[in-house]
Amino acid sequence: MNVSVNIKNVTKEYRIYRTNKERMKDALIPKHKNKTFFALDDISLKAYEGDVIGLVGINGSGKSTLSNIIGGSLSPTVGKVDRNGEVSVIAISAGLSGQLTGIENIEFKMLCMGFKRKEIKAMTPKIIEFSELGEFIYQPVKKYSSGMRAKLGFSINITVNPDILVIDEALSVGDQTFAQKCLDKIYEFKEQNKTIFFVSHNLGQVRQFCTKIAWIEGGKLKDYGELDDVLPKYEAFLNDFKKKSKAEQKEFRNKLDEARFVIK
């Protein structure tokens, strides 16, 4: 199998400023030290053709940051991502303009992807049909529910037939019938040996079609491997975490976050 995505020592840092004065000092003074948050810390993994990788972890662990870097909408501070093929990212409202109608968003997003108007015209009916939006396709997206936005975004991205698909919680909203239709489409992609990254808190969906699991905790890759090896460990952790009181859960999160802040 060929490597489709190679994530090499990826770190994503955010400088934290309490005042504009701190921001100015950081811009003007060489090697000025400031509080820095590590959203991701030295993550490396390889994805092969046909892999369906579930990105799991509690809220704030860094899953969406990693998916955005894989998709190319966010750049790492350190490290690199090599991609072998076209990438599409499906997240709620990703790449959609609230001021434009649904059909205008189809054209705008596909133009940004590099498609010609003739190609867009030919593909638009398929996108509208898959989205099930009907007459709402002519309404501004700002009037859409989160489920409708997810339907439109998913329909555009699966119709353009990418080599690598990144799905970030896009199936967590909307009706279950549409979600199942999306999963069926993802199965088709899987059979075509495409690479899929799937961010979800729905472990039923993760178990249903993922082949591998990347467990992100506190911005670090805690574990990565075959579904049957990693998912039971994560489920055991999650069961223990849910048994904690709200105060204990907060303390656990705070300890993880404290380790992600450094002065540099």
Swiss-Prot record:
Record: residues binding ATP: 57-64
Top-rank taxon: Bacteria
Topology class, membrane: Peripheral membrane protein
Enzyme class: translocase
SUPFAM superfamilies found in the cross-reference section: P-loop containing nucleoside triphosphate hydrolases
Stretches assigned to the ABC transporter domain: 5-243
Compartments where found: Cell membrane
A GO term from the CC aspect: plasma membrane
InterPro entries referenced in this protein's UniProt entry, alphabetically: AAA+_ATPase, ABC_transporter-like_ATP-bd, ABC_transporter-like_CS, ABC_transpr_TagH-like, Bact_Polysacc_Export_ATP-bd, P-loop_NTPase
Protein name: Teichoic acids export ATP-binding protein TagH
Functional description taken from the UniProt entry: Part of the ABC transporter complex TagGH involved in teichoic acids export. Responsible for energy coupling to the transport system.
Gene designation: tagH
Family: Belongs to the ABC transporter superfamily. Teichoic acids exporter (TC 3.A.1.104.1) family.
Keyword set, alphabetical order: ATP-binding, Cell membrane, Membrane, Nucleotide-binding, Translocase, Transport
EC number(s) reported in the record: 7.5.2.4
Gene3D superfamilies attached to this UniProt entry: P-loop containing nucleotide triphosphate hydrolases (3.40.50.300)
Catalytic activity: ATP + H2O + teichoic acidSide 1 = ADP + phosphate + teichoic acidSide 2
MF terms (GO), sorted A to Z: ABC-type teichoic acid transporter activity; ATP binding; ATP hydrolysis activity
Subunit annotation: The complex is composed of two ATP-binding proteins (TagH) and two transmembrane proteins (TagG).
The species this protein was found in: Staphylococcus aureus (strain Mu50 / ATCC 700699)
